[in-house]
């Protein structure tokens, strides 16, 4: 059984550890600036209202993740305790079989890491939007609002990209890419169910997904900065 525990642990733990490294430890230039960012400017009423909605979205996302991660564990432990109590008449979590304890430990140690990783990403994206809200022009902010209105209710305040002072910021799960939109070449996209896979070079290759309704806003940015006419 020891080898089974090790296999379970490795299968769940290693992928999470890899994502943790690329998301939390390894940072690009923008993310290093973001780590040092402290709010310095008072936002306008509209921008502050948007930021408050981002905070509310982040709070709800964290609550939902807590329920998803830990409710199954609580239910499972309750079932195991009930079964043990019916057998022995003793209500004690330590009385659960060692094999079951090891399986729970093998699964939920990686879950704890995944919990930390997702909470980090939510907090990082919230902070990034605050930083960009301070720096962007009024036209950039109006574009951000248009993108928000094109997103589903559950993702309205989690934009896949933000334009700020002639820089394009792509929000991918484990990284935020800062791109000069004038350098974008080899743009291509394909439809996959409800999303669109977008691929381009700037100069490195980047692939990410967009909701269908958001694609026109993204392509308008490309047209503006590359002087290309794009038909879609």
Tell where the protein language model's regions lie, with residue ranges:
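Eukaryotic intrinsically disordered, low-complexity regulatory linkers and tails enriched in Ser/Thr/Pro
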Residues: 1-141, 156, 230
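Short, flexible beta-strand-to-coil junctions
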Residues: 85, 97, 165, 172-173, ...
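Conserved beta-hairpin
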Residues: 122-177
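Acidic, Ser/Thr- and proline-rich intrinsically disordered linker/docking segments
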Residues: 127-145, 156, 185-232
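Domain-scale macromolecular recognition modules
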Residues: 177-180, 195-197
């Amino acid at each position: 059984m020891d080898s089974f525990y090790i296999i379970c642990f490795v299968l769940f733990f290693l992928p999470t550890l890899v994502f943790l490294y690329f998301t939390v430890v390894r940072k690009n230039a923008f993310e290093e600036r973001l780590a040092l960012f402290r709010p310095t400017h008072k936002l306008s009423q509209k921008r502050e209202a948007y930021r408050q909605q981002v905070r509310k979205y982040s709070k709800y996302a964290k609550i939902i993740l807590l329920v998803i991660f830990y409710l199954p564990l609580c239910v499972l432990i309750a079932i195991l305790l009930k079964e043990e109590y019916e057998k022995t008449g003793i209500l004690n979590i330590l009385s659960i079989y060692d094999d079951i304890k090891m399986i729970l430990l093998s699964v939920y140690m990686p879950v704890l890491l995944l919990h930390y990783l997702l909470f980090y990403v939510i907090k990082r994206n919230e902070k990034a939007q605050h930083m960009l809200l301070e720096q962007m022009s009024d036209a950039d902010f109006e574009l951000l609002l248009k993108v928000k209105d094109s997103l589903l209710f559950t993702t309205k305040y989690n934009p896949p990209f933000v334009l700020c002072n002639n820089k394009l910021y792509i929000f991918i799960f484990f990284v935020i890419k800062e791109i000069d939109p004038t350098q974008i070449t080899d743009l291509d996209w394909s439809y996959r169910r409800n999303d669109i896979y977008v691929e381009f070079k700037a100069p490195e290759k980047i692939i990410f997904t967009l909701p269908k309704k958001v694609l026109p806003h993204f392509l308008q940015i490309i047209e503006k900065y590359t002087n290309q006419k794009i038909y879609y």
